[in-house]
């Protein structure tokens, strides 16, 4: 099952083009980023990033996944805003 943190890791790598930069941005170790991406690729059955000399770029499958990941993150955020501790539907 896709988890919010894994999507955050994916988006950070996609935005920074680097596992190391993504790890700094998220405040986690580089191996944690690498493991999350590997697990995500295994789970989806898709190679999401092309790796070369410390830099990564999205594959065509990765580009499509990014579109969906962006939408999922939006809905996570919107749901949290509406139903979270201080949300509009919280007493």
Regions found by a protein language model. Give the residues of each.
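Short helix-coil-helix linker/hinge
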Residues: 1-5
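Short alpha-helical "packing" element that flanks the helix-turn-helix/winged-helix DNA-binding module
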Residues: 6-13, 65
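Short helix-boundary/capping micro-motifs
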Residues: 12-27
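Helix-turn-helix DNA-binding elements, focusing on the entry/boundary residues of the two helices
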Residues: 18-19, 37, 51
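Residues within the DNA-recognition helix of helix-turn-helix
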Residues: 29, 36-39
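A short LG(V/I)-centered, amphipathic sequence patch enriched
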Residues: 41-58
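Short, solvent-exposed amphipathic helices
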Residues: 61-79
């Amino acid at each position: 099952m896709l988890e919010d943190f894994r999507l955050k890791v994916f988006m950070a790598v996609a935005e920074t083009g680097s596992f190391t930069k993504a790890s700094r941005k998220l405040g986690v170790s580089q191996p944690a980023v690498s493991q999350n991406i590997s697990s995500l690729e295994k789970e989806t059955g898709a190679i999401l990033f092309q790796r070369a000399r410390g830099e990564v770029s999205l594959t065509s499958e990765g580009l499509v996944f990014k579109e969906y990941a962006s939408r999922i993150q939006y809905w996570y955020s919107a749901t949290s805003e509406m139903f979270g501790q201080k949300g509009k539907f919280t007493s």
